[in-house]
Amino acid sequence: MKSTMKRHHVVAIASSVTLALSLAACGSDTPEKPEGSGTGTGTASGDCAAYESYGDLSGKTVTVYTSIVAPEDQPHIDSYKPFEECTGASIKYEGSKEFETQLQVRLKAGNAPDIAYIPQPGLLKTIVGQFPDSIVEASAGTSANVDKYYAASWKGYGTVDGKFYAAPLGANVKSFVWYSPSMFADNGYEIPKTYDELIALSDKIVADHGAEGIKPWCAGIGSGEATGWPATDWLEDLVLREAGIDVYNKWITNEVKFNDPQIAAALGKVGAILKNDKYVNGGIGDVKSIATTEFQDGGLPILDGNCFMHRQASFYAANWPEGTDVSEEGDVFAFYFPGMTADSRPVLGGGEFVAAFADRPEVAAFQAYLSSPEWANAKAKATPAGGWVSANSGLDPENLVSPIDKLSFSLLSDTSQDFGFDASDLMPGNVGAGSFWAEMTSWIAENKSDTQVLDAIQASWK
């Protein structure tokens, strides 16, 4: 993928200083400045006790640069309010759809942001390798928070050559299929429990509704310079399901090649859906229309009754039109993208990571805040429409108001099933955020063959 962060629609630049959302009421206008590392365990009292260790940061400004843009940017901006009120600092937020390219342009020009949300660990490795003097190792407070509130694997994703740089931020579950509960009920369709049942359901929809022009699936992979990432998620989900977690992890490190028969078999299964003109692209167009449809719009034909299913991550909840009821009995909901057997339930997921590019106390404090339970719970409360979760164990699931977020959190916290972190996010940036996206787009837009695509991606691996 591409991560959770390539999915965003327009550029948004805003300061959260003037926002009116009150997530926490601070106990004093001028916080005390006691010693501490910023690793408080949370505050239920609504005061600034958990923020005291950050010190008095009045008059200080921290700039944040991300690829998260409207409509997903506002909850992030709102979630900074408690930190601003309790420390006196101001957070200046900038989101850009061209983040992946522009961050490196800014680093080359010496115009680095204080904080950046890195959507791919592979990109983090690239930045550390190319700009070692620009990026700053994570603060002690940040490191302590991650040790306490996250599984060890998450810290590993933000570590390069033994040095910890970037703390996890949000997390997401990719293994979802969005659908209309009422459309399923009206047609007597049941939620598939295996991959074969999913294909059988798709064939049943073609038989029942093909003559009406209604398709089983609708999709879009457009995302500016990150176009193609939704298609990579499809392949990752199928590799994880068909080949298993061991092959999946070896694929990430290039021990298993892109043109390995196991990866080719998974791509064949993806093509049986996305390149099947009987299956796609409901309410939008032909197979090639998938490449020109923005990912935000890819699932909307479900609401018009023109398609039945849309495979997309938990964060897609934020892209349904205002007023859409996202629940088991609502306008739309999601079911788990089934495994090959009913007992096999691997989960594909991803997340963003917070890196610092300035060694100042206010920057270290804000990075620590973003790794804390205080921020995770503030962010959950600031996202009333849903579409966001975290792997932070300090997150109270009661603060997740959306049924899909609660379902996601339950999957993220289920250690009995294999969890595969988004493969392209862990690959080198030129592959995971480069050739993989581009070739999957050409696979659809230009009808390149499976072999051509897989060989081209493999050739790009340096």
PLM features: what roles do these ranges have?
Residues 26-50:
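Short, low-complexity, disordered segments immediately C-terminal to signal peptides
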Residues 46-56, 121-175:
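Hinge/lid segment of periplasmic solute-binding proteins
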Residues 47, 58-69, 89-94, 115, ...:
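Short, well-ordered beta-strand elements
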Residues 79-152, 182-193, 301, 308-309, ...:
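Extracytoplasmic "Venus flytrap"/periplasmic binding protein-like
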Residues 127-129, 154-196, 220-251, 348-355, ...:
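Periplasmic solute-binding protein
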Residues 252-288:
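Glycine-centered hinge/linker elements that transmit conformational signals in sensory
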Residues 309-315, 321-387:
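Extracytoplasmic/periplasmic substrate-recognition and gating elements
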Residues 386-391, 406-461:
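C-terminal capping/gating helix-and-loop segments adjacent to ligand/active sites or protein-protein/ligand interfaces
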